[in-house]
Amino acid sequence: MKKHLLALGLLLVGVSPAQALDVGDISSFMNSGSSTLSKTIKNSTDSGRLINIHLERLSSPLDGGQVIPMDKPDEVLLTPASLLLPAQASDVIRFFYKGPADDKERYYRIVWFDQALSDAQRDNANRSAVATASARIGTILVVAPRQVNYRFQYANGSLTNTGNATLRILAYGPCLKAADGKECKENYYLMPGKSRRFTQVDTANKKGRVALWQGEQFVPVK
């Protein structure tokens, strides 16, 4: 599974070591100009899987984030919420944002319950086996503000997000430490109000480059 984590630690519920369901990126972003998002999931095993999906709103995607009420019952819709996924098959799950069109960034945890189809069909006498053959996977959905305001400050190798939407920031160029090699690259997600210092790339070097993504727009910084 690709793991593009939010900076400072992404809240993630337990994932089985022998994960059968591939849900793609751990962090998914719905930009301000879009109200829909699609995620492709894949069953990489040789048996069918029963997949159930539900979504809950978080105060923050970072460690310590709490589940909080939705602003409205149909704030985010998804389809399908339950499906049978055959062996080595894939399917697309679609999410629809119907929430407030304001200046707040919103965070949601998508919880994927993955269960072997053979276990789901067993009778009550054998139901204890279901827990060991099931996985509960958590991924993050970030919905950018509908009234987005991208702003940032950069100084001395440190970027601060002074806007209201998460930025994807990157630096590349000569390594700061010789032990790291000649060329280094750093990528992070930077939430509103947070700062990040680049520690591997020598950003003071004239060949060092700093840039960021504002939604789908690439912005050179240095």
From Swiss-Prot:
Induction: Positively regulated by EcpR. Residues 1-20 form the signal peptide. InterPro entries: EcpB_C, Ig-like_fold, PapD-like_sf. Keywords: Chaperone, Fimbrium biogenesis, Signal. The keyword Chaperone applies. Part of the ecpRABCDE operon, which encodes the E.coli common pilus (ECP). ECP plays a dual role in early-stage biofilm development and host cell recognition. Belongs to the EcpB/EcpE family. This is Probable fimbrial chaperone EcpB. It comes from Klebsiella pneumoniae (strain 342).
